[in-house]
């Protein structure tokens, strides 16, 4: 059992489906909340940017951890929001089916053990030439109090 085993089973299930290569696959962990309009924002990013991976979670660790002190991001504007390149996210992310198929072995490799090593997985994917973008401000958040995506009153929004 465990989170990594569940995510591995999900990855294997999805990869066996007969989706179109351009279909958007969105993986969502069970401890995330989303702002209204998140579907439109995700589609906007996919349709206007063309990155490999997308996250609606503006992870707060990028703002305070010493390891990100010198982090440089490319800022991209779409019709209604800004996006930035980011080196990692959690297992709540989107990609096109063709991207998942291309990198499935990497996803599965980082699911070995009790927990998915999501940070290491995305930094490894980055090293392999893929990219990840995050909308700013975030349209989703981890619901742990110290992991909330900044600039949104999530407590008010989730009541």
Report each predicted region and the residues it spans:
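Conserved catalytic core of nucleotide-sugar-dependent glycosyltransferases
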Residues: 33-107
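C-terminal catalytic/acceptor-binding lobe
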Residues: 97-98, 102-159
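Conserved residues at the C-terminal ends of beta-strands
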Residues: 28, 56-57, 138
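Active-site-proximal specificity loops/subdomain of glycosyltransferases
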Residues: 1-23
């Amino acid at each position: 059992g465990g989170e990594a085993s569940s995510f591995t089973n999900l990855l294997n299930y999805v990869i066996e489906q007969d989706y179109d290569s351009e279909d958007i696959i969105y993986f969502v962990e069970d401890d995330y909340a989303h702002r209204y309009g998140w579907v439109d924002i995700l589609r906007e990013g996919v349709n206007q940017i063309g990155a490999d991976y997308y996250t609606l979670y503006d992870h707060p660790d990028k703002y305070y951890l010493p390891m990100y002190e010198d982090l440089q991001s490319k800022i991209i504007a779409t019709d209604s929001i800004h996006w930035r390149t980011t080196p990692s996210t959690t297992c709540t992310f989107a990609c096109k089916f063709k991207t998942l198929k291309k990198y499935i072995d990497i996803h599965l490799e980082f699911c070995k053990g009790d927990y998915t090593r999501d940070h290491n997985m995305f930094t490894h994917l980055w090293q392999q030439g893929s990219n990840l973008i995050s909308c700013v401000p975030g349209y989703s958040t981890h619901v742990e109090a110290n992991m909330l995506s900044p600039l949104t009153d999530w407590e008010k929004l989730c009541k």
